[in-house]
Amino acid sequence: MNRDAHTVQAQEKLSERCSDCATLSYDLHIHSCLSPCGDDDMTPGNIVGMAAIKGLDVIAVTDHNSCKNCPAVMKLAAQYGILVIPGMELTTAEEVHAVCLFPELSAALEFDRFVYEKLIKFPNREDIFGKQQIMNEEDICIGTEPNLLINSTTLSFDELWDI
């Protein structure tokens, strides 16, 4: 399997740091500033910085119906030996919130495109829900998502289960 470069780098540093670790510390449900429920301070740099301060070995970025901030977090975290599992909190047609985790960034981004086609499009109102910011690894906003990401998708739970 072809591994993403940032995943390989993080795994190598994690292996060095935890060669005799009996346990790993992790948080597998983190929202960034892309999620409407996330704070504007939840930038890639702040997520990675807090993970390092807390001594986390593994984190997963799981924004609502999007994986677009995973690349920046993965790039930064690899420098600290923190393994990032790219993910998404998908909202099904039944309003079930399912945390989806991926072995590779490429798989996450492919799923992101698939889910976006299934997202019920409703314009985001920044005055109510806040900005939905797409960031780079320098914590610079490189775009915003115009459609509200906390909406459900047309994807049923059964369809998700079968993927």
Q: Which residue ranges define each predicted feature?
A:
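Active-site environment of divalent metal-dependent phosphoester hydrolases
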Residues: C33-S35, V61-P71, T91-E94
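An N-terminal RHG(E/S)-centered segment typical of histidine phosphatases
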Residues: C18-C21, S32-L34
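Acidic/histidine-rich helix-loop elements
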Residues: S32-M42
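Aromatic/hydrophobic pocket-lining residues that form π-stacking "cages" and hydrophobic walls in ligand
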Residues: I47, C70-V73, L160
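Hydrophobic faces of well-ordered beta-strands that scaffold small-molecule active sites
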Residues: Y26-I30, I59-A60, V84-M88
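Conserved, mostly hydrophobic/aromatic
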Residues: H29, D63, C100
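Divalent metal-dependent hydrolysis catalytic cores, especially in the metallo-beta-lactamase
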Residues: V48-H64, E89
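Extended substrate/RNA-proximal surfaces in nucleic-acid metabolism proteins
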Residues: N2-R17, T23, L76-I163
